[in-house]
A protein has these predicted regions:
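Short, surface-exposed beta-edge/turn micro-motifs
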Residues: 56-61, 99-100, 112-115, 123-125
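Extracytoplasmic
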Residues: 40, 46, 83, 96-97, ...
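Amphipathic, non-transmembrane alpha-helical stretches in extra-cytosolic proteins
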Residues: 79-82, 86, 125, 151-153, ...
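Mid-chain, structured segments of secreted extracytoplasmic proteins
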Residues: 66-110
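C-terminal partner/receptor-binding element of secreted or periplasmic proteins
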Residues: 132-161
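Early exported N-terminus immediately downstream of N-terminal targeting peptides
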Residues: 24-78
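Bacterial Sec-dependent N-terminal signal peptides
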Residues: 1-27
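A short, solvent-exposed beta-edge/loop patch
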Residues: 105-139
């Protein structure tokens, strides 16, 4: 009985830690608002998949159709989150952010770095939130590891791109 209670407690801790990820960031409302809309693709990778050779501990992405209201909404909240933090890279065209990689600091535990990736194409907007135990200088190498990660679904190999 004690073993079952201990396992239940551990499971609840893991669930609550995942639920708290990105709660303090403004960009969270974008995932909540647009993540379940028709045509949007929301992906969250579990830690058991991410632990295969990567230091990324949490991954959540949203791909949604692009329109002026969504773009304005995303950029306003993104500016609030990256204020006084590190811009790892940013590409602007005609004064408009087309893509960006941002380090938004450590999470509440103070151990894990948080990152937001943003890409704006004419037909879609992509936002990625991730956490990991690595400095901003190693983000590119961690993303390459993630890109090479294979997910097996119904005995088929799907490569993340």
């Amino acid at each position: 009985m004690k073993y079952k209670m201990l396992m239940l407690y551990c499971l609840l801790q893991i669930i609550s830690m995942s639920a708290l990820a990105q709660d303090h960031l403004n960009i969270k409302s974008i995932f909540d608002k647009y993540g379940k809309q028709e045509g949007s693709v929301l992906v969250q990778l579990s830690s058991d998949i991410l632990s295969q050779g990567s230091n990324i501990t949490f991954y959540k992405s949203l791909i949604m159709s692009n329109d002026v209201a969504k773009e304005r909404d995303v950029l306003n909240l993104l500016k609030l989150d990256i204020d006084k933090n590190v811009i790892v890279s940013e590409v602007k065209k005609n004064g408009k952010v087309e893509s960006g990689t941002y380090y938004v600091g450590k999470d509440k535990s103070g151990k894990t770095g948080e990152y937001i990736l943003y890409k704006n194409k004419p037909d879609k907007i992509t936002i990625v939130y991730l956490k990991g135990n690595f400095p901003p200088a190693r983000l590119d190498s961690e993303l390459k590891k993630l890109k090479d990660l294979f997910i097996y679904v119904n005995d088929k190999r799907l490569k993340i791109q």
